[in-house]
């Protein structure tokens, strides 16, 4: 299916595939090298079952999902679809577009005979780019598991026998055995391409110990010691945040004034 449309709001949605990705924008990265890095990551995932739909109208309105066995997160969710990102922002909010996109994911999951759908969420300031648990609860999702850092794995079962998905132990209790700052990231989120080098430069300029680790392998991502793999920042072994830091925010986090 290349497109689907909803009569209620007259919006059409385009499916991004290996055939059209070079000529289509992908919402979260509309230009420059950020888009190139994200698109390269997507191209490698399409063969693994990744689906990406965006609104025909230009803006931040899209869903990205993949069979859970191929998801770049440390979860056990056999038979599930995992939503990488469901993002509706700015002027796109308030028109029912999220319901359209989630509805298409549910339809697809049923067509594939999947046990259900799962997605990460968090409350309040911890949420950032993760989904709103209140919205997910309204749509029938319930909490399957919770990491020590407060990030939850929510799920929508589609069969009576669906097993509850869960975090792997490494994600349930995120910690590492290294001192200083350690940052794990992937190219799944285009903003890492821009901000990680700038944070690294700022850390070096201020003598702050920072090790950056780009994850480029699914198996490594699926066993990372954090529930979020697109961006996971640790300090002295403890998980700090999955929120992508600007250079200024990172320096403030490190205690640099001014």
Task: List each model region and its residues.
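Conserved active-site alpha-helix within GNAT-family acetyltransferase domains
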Residues: 123-148
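Short amphipathic alpha-helix that is part of the acyltransferase structural core
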Residues: 2-58, 170, 191, 195-202
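C-terminal "cap" of GNAT-fold acetyltransferases
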Residues: 148-173
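Conserved GNAT acetyl-CoA-binding A-motif
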Residues: 109-127
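Non-catalytic, surface beta->alpha helical segment in thiol-disulfide oxidoreductase systems
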Residues: 237-258
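Conserved beta-strand in the GNAT
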Residues: 54, 58-69, 82, 87
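Conserved acetyl-CoA-binding loop-helix of GNAT-fold acetyltransferases
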Residues: 88, 94-110
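A conserved beta-turn-beta hairpin within the catalytic core of GNAT-like acetyltransferases
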Residues: 71-83, 93
